[in-house]
């Protein structure tokens, strides 16, 4: 339409000049056109703060654990880092003279309550849960890289504290992860990170190397990602394949040696798994 209007204006100008009998040539540069400019400034993004948690199986949807103890969120902020990790709950077992194997319970999360404009509701610095939108997920870690530049990174996992109750420890206890997948918002452009070990074991051995969960080469891995261990039935991954079995409660296993299971004092035992984003 702009081209049509410009041509019509030129024709009128030529006719006008011809009528006046002018011998001046028509000037291509005239006062009928002027450019404006558009400006935008891009800065590094920010991750962390506790309100950027999302569903590992629906990466665009904000979620919360509803004030429970299912998820630990990142209180600090920066242009890259670990945003959230799920906490393992292996339930209860009775003292016995046999090796104990217990699977972690699924992670219970809730969709975030939305305001009239569709934005997540934040109360006291935390997402407000829609208690009518309960979801069960596998154990997971969420991270993001919104740096300007950077030469890639690794996501690593390591058992940094053995299960302990005061001075009592479950010596030799291990945690096995399986059914690992990488998930992300497919609208993100660029090269994605590579999934590391999909099956691995964490032990208390201080000499053991951290397990590499995911790796991003230089210039890759920008955006937000999830590694999830166990998926709900019906979940469709980025490969387009539907998960037909619910593995949310059968993918992370605690093993306690028989000698320890028979003699450990009763009580609550807590271990620590540290997830680290090692930037290059």
What are these regions (language model features)?
Residues 2-4, 19-280:
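Signature of Gram-negative chaperone-usher
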Residues 5-11:
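Sec-dependent signal peptide hydrophobic core
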Residues 11-20:
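Hydrophobic core
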């Amino acid at each position: 339409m702009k081209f049509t209007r410009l041509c019509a204006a030129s024709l009128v100008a030529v006719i006008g000049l011809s009528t006046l009998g002018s011998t001046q040539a028509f000037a291509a540069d005239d006062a009928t056109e002027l450019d404006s400019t558009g400006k935008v400034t891009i800065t590094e993004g920010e991750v962390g703060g506790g309100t950027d948690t999302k569903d590992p199986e629906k990466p665009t949807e904000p979620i919360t654990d509803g004030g429970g103890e299912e998820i630990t969120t990142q209180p600090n902020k920066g242009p890259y880092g670990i945003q959230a990790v799920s906490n393992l709950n292996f339930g209860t077992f009775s003292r016995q003279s046999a090796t104990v194997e217990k699977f972690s319970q699924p992670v219970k999360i809730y969709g975030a309550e939305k305001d009239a404009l569709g934005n997540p509701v934040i109360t006291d610095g935390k997402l407000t849960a829609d208690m009518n939108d309960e979801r069960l997920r596998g154990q997971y870690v969420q991270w993001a890289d919104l740096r300007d530049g950077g030469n890639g990174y690794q996501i690593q996992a390591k058992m940094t504290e053995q299960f302990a109750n005061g001075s009592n420890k479950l010596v030799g206890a291990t945690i096995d992860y399986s059914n690992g997948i990488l998930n992300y918002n497919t609208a993100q452009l660029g090269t994605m990170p590579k999934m590391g070990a999909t099956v691995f074991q964490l032990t208390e051995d201080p000499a053991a190397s951290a397990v590499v969960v995911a790796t991003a080469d230089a210039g890759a891995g920008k955006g937000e990602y999830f590694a999830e261990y166990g998926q709900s039935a019906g979940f469709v991954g980025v490969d387009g394949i539907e998960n037909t079995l619910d593995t949310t409660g059968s993918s992370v296993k605690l093993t306690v040696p028989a000698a320890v299971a028979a003699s450990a004092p009763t009580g609550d035992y807590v271990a620590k798994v540290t997830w680290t984003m090692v930037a290059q």
